[in-house]
Amino acid sequence: MAKTLSKSSGGALAPWLGISLIVILFDQLTKIAVLKTFAYGAMHALTPFFNLTLIYNRGAAFGFLATAGGWQRWAFTALGIGATLVICYLLKRHGHQRLFSLSLALILGGALGNVIDRLIYGHVIDFLDFHVGAWHWPAFNLADSAITVGAVLLIYDELRRVRGAR
């Protein structure tokens, strides 16, 4: 008979880590392809509003602290590793909560994808460039997308939980 998970027992960590691993693999494979295909700073238009490019981000989201002098590489790496530990703890404890755990798995995969870049290259590889006319959204990557989707799902899950408690 299959063992069922109760709210008090937490849940299996492996499925959620598997999702994180898939995010990391897709993120790293796309970055490798972009590094091998594009010159730094070149833009390749795919649609009137979307380009592929190769940008190095030494800061955080939207280039925050990109010119800070190098310390940010290690600070953001440490932050990513710290987030990994907290997320793994939460996944182990709340693995039975599917939407919550999915959101954390996506955030974990994205965070580790960018940590890998910082450790290997000293910066994060960004390549997705959306724009309207001459205005460009800051370039980003699949890891950033996974973090964003995970954060949106986390907010949705919390709103759903709070509304259900009323």
Curated annotation (Swiss-Prot):
* Domain of life where this protein originates: Bacteria
Tell whether Nuclease is among the UniProt keywords. Answer: no
Q: What compartments host this protein?
A: Cell inner membrane
Q: How does it sit in the membrane?
A: Multi-pass membrane protein
Q: Which reaction does it catalyse?
A: Release of signal peptides from bacterial membrane prolipoproteins. Hydrolyzes -Xaa-Yaa-Zaa-|-(S,diacylglyceryl)Cys-, in which Xaa is hydrophobic (preferably Leu), and Yaa (Ala or Ser) and Zaa (Gly or Ala) have small, neutral side chains
- What's one Pfam family here? Peptidase_A8
Q: Any stretches that span the bilayer, and where are they?
A: 10-30, 32-52, 71-91, 100-120, 135-155
Going by the UniProt record, its keywords in alphabetical order are: Aspartyl protease, Cell inner membrane, Cell membrane, Hydrolase, Membrane, Protease, Transmembrane, Transmembrane helix
Active site (record annotation): 126, 144
Q: What is its EC number?
A: 3.4.23.36
Kinase as UniProt keyword: no
Q: What class of enzyme is it?
A: hydrolase
Q: In which pathway does it act?
A: Protein modification; lipoprotein biosynthesis (signal peptide cleavage)
- Any GO MF annotation of the entry: aspartic-type endopeptidase activity
Q: Report one GO cellular component.
A: plasma membrane
Query: Which biological processes are named by the entry's GO terms?
Result: proteolysis
Family annotation (PANTHER family): LIPOPROTEIN SIGNAL PEPTIDASE
Function statement: This protein specifically catalyzes the removal of signal peptides from prolipoproteins.
Q: What is this protein called?
A: Lipoprotein signal peptidase
